[in-house]
Amino acid sequence: MKLTFLGAGAWGTALASHAAAANDVVLWGRDPAQLAAIAATRENAAYLPGVTLSERLAVQADFEQAVAHAADDADGIVVVATPVAGLREMTRRLAARGARPVSMLWLCKGFESGTHLLPHQMVRAELDAAGRTEGFAYGVLTGPSFAREVALGLPCALTVAGNEPSLAERAQAAFHHHAMRIYGSDDLTGVEVGGAVKNVLAIATGASDGLGLGLNARAALVTRGLAEMTRLGLALGGRVETFMGLAGVGDLILTATGDLSRNRKVGQQLAAGQSLEQILAGLGHVAEGVRCAQAVAELASAYGVEMPIARAVCAVLFDGLSAADAVAQLLQRDARDE
């Protein structure tokens, strides 16, 4: 199968390298020098230092040629590997092509800043505006996955959800090999809510661990955080079983407890007294939990959903509340049934 990856960051590169073992894969990025270095050294030194990439992975600096590689093939898939902030631009560029409709997957997790739209809602809006909804297959590949582990060939299980069953089937054919398993879903809303909210909750568990509050506290935050994720997901139209799966509790456990998690690191550094500006300056990579915390809190208010942990994270990030005071406030909440 022909696949094109748009975005040469950690996750796009890792998944492209995995896919190249069984498919005809092209990787595009905004920096031609970075792509040339990947081709010459078989390493993405900026995002996956020390990891050897597949010899079968090809790079292409020309956007149109890269897209045409997969988009002009009947079964091909264009994989958008940008953060949420770049998804509209990529969708717009794909929709503007005069050729046949594109099958596209994205890898990003979060809500759009300002609109609070989920990724599939952003994509649908762009396709509607371009008059290109007919024939476009689109969806998300998501779940508990650290890019470095995938690039190293370690076991991983993900969920693909799309607007057409045929896209999920092709994604399974493309990625379900070696150490990766792909499960299908038709709950686009549910899997995307899980992927967005878990990043915010991971900041909370990171802060708890940074304050030395122990494993009991971590387990409580993960469990009650899952309840918050599920409540918001149901309010937005997701299904409860989705949050019990890979895109819900699975991704939450990994991001909240794994030391490779950028969102968890943000919480740990907030607990150590660093400012958000200092943390983001030193991070070097995207921490989507910071970007979507406000959206989660505002959606909770708009839909009347109780999300005290997510609200506490938002207050620490943007309202000057200390991590220690946020924990104290959560502990002072009235007793209630689970």
From Swiss-Prot:
InterPro entries: 6-PGluconate_DH-like_C_sf, 6PGD_dom2, G3P_DH_NAD-dep, G3P_DH_NAD-dep_C, G3P_DH_NAD-dep_N, NAD(P)-bd_dom_sf. SUPFAM superfamilies: 6-phosphogluconate dehydrogenase C-terminal domain-like, NAD(P)-binding Rossmann-fold domains. Its main location: cytoplasm. Pathway: Membrane lipid metabolism; glycerophospholipid metabolism. It holds the Pfam family NAD_Gly3P_dh_C. It is found in: Cytoplasm. Keywords: Cytoplasm, Lipid biosynthesis, Lipid metabolism, NAD, NADP, Nucleotide-binding, Oxidoreductase, Phospholipid biosynthesis, Phospholipid metabolism. Sn-glycerol 3-phosphate binds at residues 109, 143, 145, 198, 251, 261-263. NADPH binds at residues 11, 30, 109, 147, 262, 286, 288. It catalyses: sn-glycerol 3-phosphate + NAD(+) = dihydroxyacetone phosphate + NADH + H(+); sn-glycerol 3-phosphate + NADP(+) = dihydroxyacetone phosphate + NADPH + H(+). Its EC number is 1.1.1.94. GO terms for biological process: carbohydrate metabolic process; glycerol-3-phosphate biosynthetic process; glycerol-3-phosphate catabolic process; glycerophospholipid metabolic process; phospholipid biosynthetic process. GO terms for molecular function: glycerol-3-phosphate dehydrogenase [NAD(P)+] activity; NAD binding. The active site is at 198 (proton acceptor). One of its GO terms (cellular component) is cytosol. Catalyzes the reduction of the glycolytic intermediate dihydroxyacetone phosphate (DHAP) to sn-glycerol 3-phosphate (G3P), the key precursor for phospholipid synthesis. Belongs to the NAD-dependent glycerol-3-phosphate dehydrogenase family. This is Glycerol-3-phosphate dehydrogenase [NAD(P)+]. It comes from Cupriavidus necator (strain ATCC 17699 / DSM 428 / KCTC 22496 / NCIMB 10442 / H16 / Stanier 337). The lineage of its organism: Bacteria, Pseudomonadati, Pseudomonadota, Betaproteobacteria, Burkholderiales. The gene is gpsA.
